[in-house]
Amino acid sequence: MWKEKVQEYEGQIIDDLKGLLSIESVRDDSKASDETPVGPGPRQALDYMYEIAQRDGFSTHDVDHIAGRIEAGKGDDVLGVLCHVDVVPAGDGWDSDPFNPVVTDDAIIARGTLDDKGPTIAAYYAVKILNDMKVDWKKRIHIIIGTDEESDWKCTERYFQTEEMPTLGFAPDAEFPAIHGEKGITTFDLVQNSTSEDQDEPDYELISFESGQRYNMVPDHAQARVFVKENMTDVVQHFEHYLDQHKLQGESVVDSGELVLTLEGKAVHGMDPSLGVNAGLYLLDFISTLNLNQTAREFVDFSNRYLHESHFGEKMGMKFHTDVMGDVTTNVGIISYDNKQGGRFGINLRYPQKFEFEEAIQRFTKEIKAYGFDLELGKVQQPHFVDKNDPFVQKLVKAYRNQTGDMSEPYTIGGGTYARNLDKGVAFGAMFEDSEDLMHQKNEYITKKQLFNATSIYLEAIYSLCVEG
């Protein structure tokens, strides 16, 4: 029944999704204002969702242009459907324009198709189809739309300061059949707190280093500028050998008398950095083989001592595992250095329940002072958990099973979704077991089958929760 209903709307679903995907809704603090709190792109995407909702007869409510909601249904209780329309930067290497969606016979290709614009449109259409059917609602529905999920969650933080908290809800921002637990998440910076004088003149001086744009992405590009006193050719040959040895891509050029080294890695979501190749850490590893100026020497040695090839907190002394939630993970998402200020590393740490977070951070903060580094702690989100046997979770899982025939059990992830804003919130799709996960990677796409199947699952789930009651 539900798949047949979705078939009637397939063309509209694709058209509305294409419109949303065409908006480059990447956070841009350089253009932030009261009207565009995290930049014009996210605001434009939020307004777009209001426009299609108003076109379809729904009420909308805006909260300071950083978040808002689409309202449907009636009743005392509220089901929250928590979505986001901001996206991570596109990065390099796409086969097409990431913000000019390509529709093939079986897929849509663009940044945000999986994370989270495709699932947002699927969930929206589930509510729209039920509303068009004029069902007898037993609950209200708030489709809550955020614009800063990929960075600091300023959107939901502001939204829930003044707006009603849903009784229960789901975020269509992960995998099916349901995600009933999420690791704790924090970001912190490891900052070089002083520069050192050189006792002897070094052969090489690291002038600058840049890699990464987001804490929650593995950097796929790194660049270093190095002043080479002599034997430039030797360094270039040594670099080429390093690239060959580690099966990496990169290049070296001379610019204004400085050697510019670039290295390419593989970007993946920071919740499992072991699946990617951190361009920044590999380039620092190479640079560590040079006779550097002292400040740079301390910077690259710190990287190798605590960060390089350590995805699970091993080198930081934070290795920890639980059977329910898995391992601590550490992603080095942003690296920068200049020869006047020194360097810094931006870390995304994810941890399971029962990990002694505060104790670990305090110990590590004290330890790294001996190497000239301070730890600056950012926002901390505690681990989130809902019993998978809760009737709410079971209704979601039943809808998934009815639509797919797959009997998989709910599980936990290292990612973080808006579901953790709610006491009774879980992540629910829209990835399937056989979906190719290119979230935060080049050539991100969603298949039409996945998009429409997710819509039918959301249809049955919302009907079960908000019409049957």
Swiss-Prot record:
Q: Which cofactors does this gene product need?
A: Zn(2+)
Q: Where does Zn(2+) 2 bind?
A: 84, 115, 173
- Annotated organism of origin: Staphylococcus haemolyticus (strain JCSC1435)
For the ligand (Zn(2+) 1), the binding residues are: 115, 150, 440
Q: What is its EC number?
A: 3.4.13.-
Family statement drawn from the similarity comment of this UniProt entry: Belongs to the peptidase M20A family.
Entry cofactor note text?
Binds 2 Zn(2+) ions per subunit.
UniProt keyword annotations, A-Z: Dipeptidase, Hydrolase, Metal-binding, Metalloprotease, Protease, Zinc
Entry-linked SUPFAM superfamilies: Bacterial exopeptidase dimerisation domain (SSF55031), Zn-dependent exopeptidases (SSF53187)
Name one process (GO BP) from the record: L-arginine biosynthetic process
Q: Which InterPro entries match?
A: Bact_exopeptidase_dim_dom, M20A_pepV-rel, Peptidase_M20, Peptidase_M20A
Q: Locate the active site.
A: 86, 149 (proton acceptor)
Top-rank taxon of the source lineage equals Bacteria
- Cross-referenced Pfam families: Peptidase_M20 (PF01546)
What Gene Ontology molecular function terms does this protein carry?
acetylornithine deacetylase activity; dipeptidase activity; metallopeptidase activity; zinc ion binding
Q: What is the protein's given name?
A: Putative dipeptidase SH1171
